[in-house]
């Protein structure tokens, strides 16, 4: 298979924030940012939580009400991009790409997004992708997805950036999909670190999909409220794995290079592993 991109990577909010200090983990962001290069697509959560922390530091209080998430996202997205720009190699451009579910449920919008991402690679730019929470209404989104479900066999929500990254990996035919999280990967028993699943493989796409489904049975819970957890990650990556993309689910304390060189503990998913 021919791949258009070397890597689609994703990092979650939990991995970006220094919880004790209540700020961005600048050491981690700097380390990861310096590894980004053209041919990589970086899907980054964190805008909402960064916006919340920034608002609290400036005002001493939190925002109340149903619009808090969108307000925080609007405040945090600029800070998130500024932080990446600060640490990415200055020889490379950094481009903000905000998406919603329509970009994966409408063929014309999908092609437009794909063209943008391909041009980033050609123009020495690194796209930083996030879901556009600032302008996304939960009620409207649900109505739109319901309407789409009448016309399409599959509908992609993509509110979870694990799904966003997986859909992008399919869209651009990525060689590797790397999902950074706050644990080392998928566990047979999430309470026992010795049960880390190192590989999920198969001789072909069909067998691989069956093995992914089997491992979903062991996945319960999530690392934070509102997250979908390991089970959802495995569900989201099935299509990418079936098309030939190699998936890593790894701890964000490691570098991209360490994970891709198979030198640190993680879960690796792919055909004929």
Give the residues covered by each predicted segment.
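C-terminal catalytic "cap/lid" subdomain
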Residues: 1-273
